[in-house]
Amino acid sequence: LKEKEPGGFTGPTEFAKRIPGRQLYEDCYICGEIDFIFGSATAYFKNCELYALNRNEKINSYYTAPSTYSNQKYGYVFDHCRLTGNCPDRTVMLSRPWRIYAKAVFLNCEMSGQITETGFSDWNKEESHDTCYYAEYNCHGEGYVPQKRPPYVHQLTEAEAEEYTMEKVLNAPVYPAEP
């Protein structure tokens, strides 16, 4: 990991190269339109603001589209992040699986009312219901509606959430990309 640099950034373009590895984003402002956090890295986001931009669509944005490989223990973990934007209410989704083994966990996050009640999309990949791992723990805000989440989204216990500390996630093995 490189030293932390202050500031924020705009999500990469759609076809920018992504490299598997471990990444830490702390106290960042991350802004984009659609799938603006994408790739196969194991990444930990701590105290970040994720800002979704309005595209004037029925679904304006997806914050994440993990392309996690099947042999990775972790994908994206968001800890104490704020999920905001300038989109109308209920027009943004937290995540959709780029690959069917997508992993994204949201811990202690503030979720604005622009997030849909279901929160997550299977992107018409029903097989991902058995293979992806989406989870939430101790989130709050108008966009956190756990009783409306799909059955494949886990609501973690405190003990389960302890498996997603920064130390555990960033020290997990990173395997080469699958062929």
Indicate where each model-derived feature is located.
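Sequence-level preference for short, compositionally simple segments enriched
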Residues: 1-179
